[in-house]
Each structure stands twice: as C-alpha cells, then as structure tokens.
Amino acid sequence: MSGDDFDMEEEIKARIPKNFNPQKYNIKFYFDVLNLIYNVNGEIILTSLTDNPQYLIINALTSKYEIKSMNILKFDKIMDDWKVIQTYYLESLPNPKDNIEECIYFPLENIIVDDLLKIEFEVEGEVELLNLTGLAVNFNEPKIQSLKKNKLSNIWENKIKDWPKETIKENPIIESLVLSVVSEPNFIRLIFPCFDEPCYKSVFSFQLILDKYYMDAFPKLKCITNGSLIKVEPIENNSKYLFTYKDTPLMSIYLFTFVVGNYDMIETVNENNIKIRVFTPLKNHHDGALAMNMIQNGIKFYHNFFNIKYYYDKIDLVPIPDMSFRAVENLGCIVFINYAMLFGHFQSILEKKLISRTCCHELSHMWFGNLVTMEWWNDIWLNEGFARLFEYLCLNSFENEKMKYWDNYIELIYESALTSDERISTHPINVEVPSARNIEEIFDNISYAKGSSVIRMLYYYLGEDLFKKSIRLYMEENKFKNTTTEILWKCFNNVTQLDILTLMNEWVNIPSHPILSIDINKNNINIKQTAYNKSDLLWKIPLFVKCSKKEKIILMESKEINIDFKDLNLIYDDIENGTDYIIINSDLKGFYRVDYDGKNENNIIDLYKKQNDKVNYNISEYDIFGILSMKLMKEDWSGLIEILKKLKPINSYLLLKYTKGIYQNVLTKKCYLEGYESVLDEINQKKEEEKVKEINNIFLGLIDNDPDFIKKIENKFYINEENKDMYKDQYNDEYESVFLYFLCIIGDNVDVVKKMFMNDLKDFEFMNKNYKYIMIEAIMKNINLLESDVQVQYYEEFLKDYISNYYVNSTLIKRDNQNALLNFDNCSKEVIELLINKIFSEVNDIRYGFSFSQLFKRNKSKLNIFCSLMEGFHKNYINSGDKTISFLTYLKNNRNSIELANKFMLLRKLLLYVGNDKNLKIQIIEKSISKFPEIKQEDKEELFSLFL
C-alpha cells in the first residue's frame, strides 16, 4: 500500500497508519530522585513500508511531558551517515490529526521505500508519587492517581527535597522508594513518543542514569530492566552512574519496563543456562523461594509443551508496591504487585496457590504474547485466554495432585466465565477496540476466563496430542511475529484436518453461550440448544457424553440432535429404574450449561452419593457442580436446597465452597423458599430474622458435625511444638476452613469460637495461616463473648491492627470474604469505620453492598455509617489538591471510569438495601449532602434521582 492510499477519514481512530516500522529504540533515561523529574534522550530507527510515504505519525501524549527537541534524520548512503532533514521544537510541532488520538503528525517529502529514517528526541517530565506504603513511583499509570499523590508530594517537598544529599541514606522514605515503569497496554506514550501498538516489534537498547549520591547511599539499590546488565560506569565528573544493558530480542513496546529499588535477591542458573533472579524487599529474601520454584518448574513444562526453548538469557521477577494489574509479563523482567509474588510465613495455602498461578501465568506469556503477539488488542484473548488455561496445565504437571488446582479452575475460571457471559454487559471474546481509551476495558473476565474455557473445551475435544501439535505449529510459524485469531485456527485446521476455524469462530465472535435441554424417551436422548440470551444464535457444540459404562464425544451441528441408546451401551430401563444416567457435559469440559429432566438428574445425584471405594458410577464432583450451577442460574431455590440436602454431608471442598456461595446468594438475591415471603423482607424485621435463622439451619445441616473431626480442627487453631507435625499436611485445610465457616459463622458454634480467642497478641503469629480469615471473622462476630471491658478493648486494638495490615491487603477477601463485614456488628463504630475507609481506599467491588446493608440493619446506625461512606468516598475520589469540586460534577465528568463506576454503584446499591422507606432514604441523602457544602442547590434534585 502506498502512502497516498491511506484515507485519514476511514482509519480506526485508535491506530496509526502502518507506513513505517520501528527497527530499534535507543533509550537513555535519567531519574532525578530529589526533584522527581525524568529526562529521556531517545532515538527510533525506522524503515519505510510504503512507496513515497507523505507523512509520519507517532504516538505521544504530550500533555504528560515537555518535548525539548525532535529531529527527523535520513540515512545518507553516499556519506554513510545520518543527515537531519527536519527539526521540530515544542512550539513548532504540528497538531495531531483530529481523527487519530494521542499522536504527533509529521509531513514528509522525498522519502522512498528503502530509506532509513531516524527520530531523535529529548523529553522531560514529572514523576508522580502514588503510594506511601512502600512508596511506589509510577509516572505512567494515571488510573491509580488520587489524593494520595498530592499528600505524598507534600511529604516529599517538606521532608526530602531540601535534605543535604549526604544524609539521604538516613531517610527511610527514600530507602523504600521503588521507581517502576509499566507499559502495558498503552502507557509508554505517556513517557516518550513511540509506536505504541503491539504490531510494531523492535529491538530495545536501554541505558539508565542515576545520581552518584543516590547509588552510594543505598548499596543494595537494584536497577532492573528487560535486558541483562552489561556495565556500570561513572560519568559527568563522577557525579552520576550510567547503566548499560544488553539489547532485547524483537518485542512489542508494551513489554518494555524497568524498576529501580532497594532489593535483596536470590538467583540460580538452570540447565539451559538461563539466569533466574527473584527480587524481594530487604531482609525478606526467603519470601521469594516459592516464586523461584514455580519459574524453574514452569520453564521445563513450557519448553516441552511448545517445543521451543526460552529464547533469552535471563528472567527476573520483581515485586512493586502499587500497580493496577496483579502482574505484567514484560520480556525478561516480570513485575508483580507484592502480594502476588511474595510468600511469607503468615500466608495461607490459598495465597500460595494465587502466587503459584500468577507466576505460571506470566511465564506462559514469554511464549503466548511475547514470542507470538496479537496484531491488535481485539485479540488480547490470544494472550490472556491461553495463559489462564496454561497456568493450570503447567501447575498440574508438577504440583501435588492434593493441591486440586483443577477444582479451583472450575470455581474461579469456568463458573465465573459462564456467570460473566450471562450478564447484560457481556461481549464476544474477540471484540473491536475502537479507541486507545477502550483498551483496558477488554482486560476482563470474558477475555481471560471465557477465552480460557473455550480453549479448554477444544483441548478436550481434540485430545492433548492433536492440541499440542497444533499449538507447536502455531508457535513455530509465528515466533517473533504478530498474529490473529484466524491464523491460530488455520494452524489447527492444518494439523487436525478438521474445520476448527468455523467451529471456534462461533465461540469467539459472538457473545453468550448455549443452554442444552435434555429429554429422555424410550427411543432416544433428545438434546436441544438455545442461547442464554434468548437470541437465535446457534453453536457447533462438542458434547462430552457419558453414562456409567461409556464416554463419547459427539459434535452437535444443529439446533437439535438425537442420540441412540445403543451408541452409549445404555438401556432406557436402567434410567427408569435409577441404576444408570446420562451426562452431556462430562466433567464440565464444554462451555455450556445443561438442564436435565427430573428423573435423570435424581439418578445422577443418588448414584454419586452411592459411590465408594468399591462402587464407581463414573460421576465426578464436577458433574454435580454443573447441576448445582444450573439451578443457581435459574434461581430454582427450592430445587437447589433439595439437591443440597441429598448431598449432605458434603465432604468435597469444591462442592462445600460452592455451597457457601449459594448460601450467600440465598441471602443477597431476596430469594423465595418454601412459600415464605422474600428472605430479606424489609417490612417485617422479625420475620426476616426468623427466615435467615431457618436458612442458616438448612445450610448448617449440610456438614457433618462429627465431634472428633471438630476436635482435630480445634487442635490446629494455633501451631505449637505439640501439633506441628499435624500441620505439615495442609491439603485438607482448605476444606476445613470452609467447614469452619459453616460451623462458626452460619452456625454460631460458641464453644468452638471460644477456643479461637488468644491469650496474648503474640499468639497471632502462631495462628494457623490456612484458618486465619475465618478465625478472625469468628472473633469479630463474637467479640461480645469476652467477659470484661479490658478484653474487649484489647481485641478492638487487635482488630484495628489486623484491618490496617492484613485484612484488605489480600485480594482473596474480594472473592471469598465479602460477607465477612457482617461479623463486625458487635464491634465499635471506630472499627467499622476503619474497615469502611480501608475498603473504599483499596478495594473496588460492588459485592460489598449487601454486607454494608446488613451492617446498617444490625448496627442501627444507618445514617452515621452511610455518611461515613460518603465522606470516605469524597476524601479519596473527589478532592484534587487544594481544589474541591462538586460531588455531582465529579460523577458526571468521570462517568467512564470503571473504578469510579464501581464506587458509585456501591453507594447506590447501599441505598437500595436500606429499605423501602423513601423518606428514610431522602433523610440519609440530605444528611450526606450536608457534609459537602460545595454541592449546589440546583444539583440536589439530580443527585436525588441518581441515588433513588
């Protein structure tokens, strides 16, 4: 395509025209730690991709930095040197074209296709402080900027900037400073001009300059980037140090990173001479051992699976205190938020699994994403969907099977994908990205979890051998290149000789998923598909069919299909008399739900319960999970409860954990059971309390209250010399932790709770780390059992410390402990408000709405607590420096912010839960508004409509 063929009016606004390709970046970065400024001297070497290009467009967000200078140079073949052909300064830079966002436009003349060009630039910008805990510096992630930035800037100005350089090492704030650059998905344009799209792969040469006084003050200061360090040398009369790093392989610019901070380090070199380094905070190097083990084993697995060795000489794992993502897969230098990488003494098996999964996920990106990269962000699922599946395949290859990672997959990935796909906000896996501002929105559960689930379905449909051969072909043909979803499916076509392209396009290009209904009659098994969203969509569906004697894979290619009993060695009478069954989605291998008829469904449940060491009907807990999830999706509460009663006692961790979620749904969904009014009937508080008590009794009856089993758990509350051997086998602790939830939170077992109370705060260090969340919840809920005011005060202080340092720091609370808030109702107002402020400052999750609402009811402080919420929201998200803006204006101006939307939805949801009394709602809003005099009178009516 020639330059003149490009139509500026038709091109997608997010993308720049592909008339040049950046071959190499040479970046020299200087960071002034005292003045919080940075300077970049850079050059980009380009080749032309079109005949006679008339312009050059490059990504840049110039509002974030000052362009000191910029030159366009052309390589003079005769002189064998570069020659400046155009020079631009800030005041003369052309304005970007209106229809291409965040870019600079340069007109060009007399450039031919084989000409080499070079862009030279110097930019200078300010570094923004984001987090006082560990003090992260990240000047290109605007998403997490808040009042914290201004507060920190003041601290920096008042306490540091004027300090003598020779005393800098005495300052703990600078010692804990971490400078990090996270580029994914398109943040690097906020630092310097570049080609900020994944389709542009380049080699990166990086140099870093730091002041000598900074380096001398902190001997353990580490400067880590994608490339291996070549040398460190003094410059500018020994006042600075220059770090020079090895060139990277070809990579997209979103993988560029560097980190500067004070770290300890552990390292090893594997059998393929790959250096593996794990960085940790000072004096915590043991916390990196788990991550090191995951990377060492993971590299072996991916080598074998892809048949391509890791293609670089090193891989670093670096924790940073503050980041929007859990981790980012930068080539050669993976960065993690602290909790996703560091495994300390007081962390649980759940946190161990989170760290293990995150390490294996990010490592898989060295192949899926970094070596083979999507052309554009609409195919981000090629990175994230595959990585989400492969983290589990990887772990399952070397971890103890007692860890039950596939159980976690069913709960956390598969079921959450179906649930996300059933929301009105769902979208295709492969989705258009029309604007750079939309890119972050597609890093969601559809790209990750649904993408993973449909690939898992293909894995089981083809079998591991064909699947592996197809993936190997895809990787080999496209290494160091960019690809699309279509290229992937064509590789599968070539290997399998099947039309995988047509089959899988339906799954990735349309939203929703099928619901299969089963009708068993004397002649055959009839299966019909309908779309969850009630549309006319149809899918080609791999059916994973099984009965007690046989399993078979059948491709359903129409709306309706009949299966003959003979094909399954099945007899109709066996189903009628309850001795056999038919399952259509065996072990939940397919991405769809199945609605069974009553007789067959009962057979599956009954035969599952009859299984033992001597009798096996080939029914797994995953099959039972599928039946429960279908009932939950349909909100068939009475049917759901009846099945749960048949399953009792529930001894499976997966099923008991899911039942815990069902219990919380029963409370939050205002569901109807056995002819009663709404479970959360707000008109009759007494009736509601009676109903909740009855629900609690139903769910408490699902566990086995075996005194010996309970005694065994009690003996593991605190670890000591007597029981430390019992603690070595932690694989049952996940089940036991959920069991304790039923016993002590749903069941209010006071005798067990009393054994949780500590004699001394030091006991907290010896608390069973796998029980710690549920034990703390039980202590919160039953603090009124303490016998004296001194004990109550003692535990109040303990809870404040726990909330501040542990409670919300783990993302596990988002998934497992939303309703833990209910257990604060006996705590003081100070403890409650501390938790509320913690959640508003660190956690974005509207699921807390129900928990807050119950807190209102139990605590009888609706107005005060709601106003505390509003005030906390106001402090964290409305103030901007010294300027205070209208709450309503802030909502209007930031309506596209996902983070803000979650906060706003939570506030609105709280009012919905308060009750049906409109006057009470108005009273709450008016009292809230009174705290914010800046809200104009004319805005109040609209504000009321927003919240009512």
Predicted regions and their residues:
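Short amphipathic alpha-helical surface patches that mediate protein-protein
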Residues: L61, R472-E476, N493, N505-N509, ...
